[in-house]
Amino acid sequence: MVSMKFLSTVFAAITAANAAEILSVPNTQDVIPDSYIVVMKDEVATSDLEAHVTWVRNHHHSGHVRRNGTLTGLKTTFDISGFRGYLGAFDHDTLDEILADDKVKFVEPNRIMRIQGTQTQRGAPWGLARLSSSRPGGSDYVYDDRAGEGVIIYGVDTGIDVNHPDFEGRATWGINTIDQDNTDGNGHGTHTAGTFAGARFGVAKKATIVGVKVLDAQGSGSNSAIMEGISWSVDHARKNNALGRAVMNLSLGGSFSQAVNDAAERAVRAGVFLAVAAGNDNQDASNYSPASAPNVCTVGATDRMDVRATFSNFGSVLDIFAPGVDVESTMPGGGTQMMSGTSMAAPHIAGLGAYLMSTENLQPSQVCDRIKQLASNSVRNPGNGSTSKLANNGIGQ
């Protein structure tokens, strides 16, 4: 796989003022190793392209023989109403020479594209069905089959049963900052993970799941343990080149904490989308953390009839509402259970964030605004100062 580090190194090595550049790509997972699309400048005539192509073939052949290489070189040319160039598989030395030619406009790594269809999950949990429906009462979840592929979701919670069959082997254990028990002794974390990325219960059915345990079996944890979990998650995403393709679900909260809010803000700034529960006290969420952090996506809960749940916090810091009453999802040991809370609403948004990153190639900083754009103004009795926006994945029925 061609790494972005190599691509940037090659570009840095080209010092000529008129040298072409290798364009960066948003998802290096799809890059075909050593395969490139070379685009010529607009003013390059067909005859100049032919001369350049001949030179490339000869240069590649002589150098490749000398280096005992196996790459095929130039494969095909294209000319689409004056948009000219070629496709080939080249080693680094040949690519350097191509980039230095002033006839070349840019080079782009060749990548895989796939059919883009939608899937329909019949008899889906009501919360999922509501995400793809224009009105309450539906039973089908319609979604784009990219479904969070290539995105990591960090479940910062009570831990996750990574062996639950609904996770299909996509879940791994990350870190435990609260105790010595590397299991989900509460069930809350496994439930939220099922909602954001389970195969049956989840929004982003192809996302990678990482369990970050910051709460104990009673569902409690210190601010410092939570901050350590946030810090570890950002560092893990950075080490795995996932910043910009990472989501954090924080179905937790407490009274206002500047330190916790600042930790959440730094995670957003680093390149992680944060979905945060608004809280369950029927109070103004501006007094809660991390719900009141300015750039997280704060989530209130609704019931099956699009009414704000009686327990859901409210207020101007809420960005969006999502289903949060009687939500069925995964539980430790392989089973399922019903839970209610803004903790159940937030993972719908974490999953939707990952989903939109994969389908629309959004940056984390764009995700919450995009979710609000796609939402319907459907929430009844949203609470004083609250939005009435209810999450939708944009497919609609």
Swiss-Prot record:
Location of the Peptidase S8 domain: 125-397
EC number(s) stated in the UniProt entry for this protein: 3.4.21.-
UniProt xrefs under InterPro entries: PCSK9_ProteinaseK-like, Peptidase_S8/S53_dom, Peptidase_S8/S53_dom_sf, Peptidase_S8_Ser-AS, Peptidase_S8_subtilisin-like, Peptidase_S8_subtilisin-rel, S8pro/Inhibitor_I9, S8pro/Inhibitor_I9_sf
Region (Disordered): 377-397
Subcellular location per the Swiss-Prot or TrEMBL entry: Secreted
Gene3D superfamilies, A to Z: Peptidase S8 propeptide/proteinase inhibitor I9 (3.30.70.80), Peptidase S8/S53 domain (3.40.50.200)
Keywords: Glycoprotein, Hydrolase, Protease, Secreted, Serine protease, Signal, Virulence, Zymogen
GO MF entry, a single one: serine-type endopeptidase activity
Glycosylation site list: N249, N384
Active site: D157 (charge relay system), H188 (charge relay system), S343 (charge relay system)
GO cellular component: extracellular region
Domain Inhibitor I9: 35-115
Ranges of compositional bias, category Polar residues: 377-391
Range of residues in the leader sequence: 1-19
One of the GO BP terms on file: proteolysis
Domain of life: Eukaryota
Propeptide residues per the UniProt entry: 20-116
Family: Belongs to the peptidase S8 family.
Physiological role: Secreted subtilisin-like serine protease with keratinolytic activity that contributes to pathogenicity.
Name this protein carries in UniProt: Subtilisin-like protease CPC735_066880
Record organism: Coccidioides posadasii (strain C735)
